[in-house]
């Protein structure tokens, strides 16, 4: 009979939850989740697959345990087939002693390290699958345990909360940025453009007076430059407003 989760393991879980919850940037949260999962269950390799908008494949695949060269040698980001696809179609914890023995196994691509034991856990946000944690090859040999699965499920629950919190923070920051754009646009239009326009009218009035030709030409050049500046500011205002249109969804922006 397997030993229950120890106090040491619970402390590691608490540390992992706190480290994830302390982050506000979603990209950082996602990377920290997979790092924490790998450390928590003593896995040699870990990954977090983020589902795409259709929910049928992966849009992002974060890994630990592989260096940059090894990751690049494997090739494109997995699409969510084989064992990875099992958790996508059936989002429940999956623990395997030997990956290759599972009927859904399709083997590994070229240059992929050999992996044997496997633990997969879905990460839910508001009752919907956001992605899946994949852990492979428990350090020291042997399969992942019941305790490992329990710890990983608990971590995934905390991860869902941290992801939701980070997405909310991103949305708030985005709204603040939009409001700041609007404020800048109003200031440019209501204050800066009006002042430049008034200065331009004054200079035109002075240029129409009788004065040496050189001075009149310089005033006309100044008026032309002010006109150009006003047009550029109006273009900038248009750009500030247009950036609000067609913004991507939180999942696409975050991943």
What residue spans do the PLM features occupy?
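Short loop/turn segments at beta-alpha junctions that line or gate ligand-sensing/allosteric surfaces
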Residues: 51-54, 64-65, 74-81, 92-107
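A short, aliphatic-rich beta-strand micro-motif
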Residues: 83, 116-124
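Coiled-coil dimerization/phosphotransfer module
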Residues: 2-31, 35-40, 44-47, 61-62, ...
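Hydrophobic residues embedded in beta-strands of well-ordered beta-sheets
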Residues: 56-59
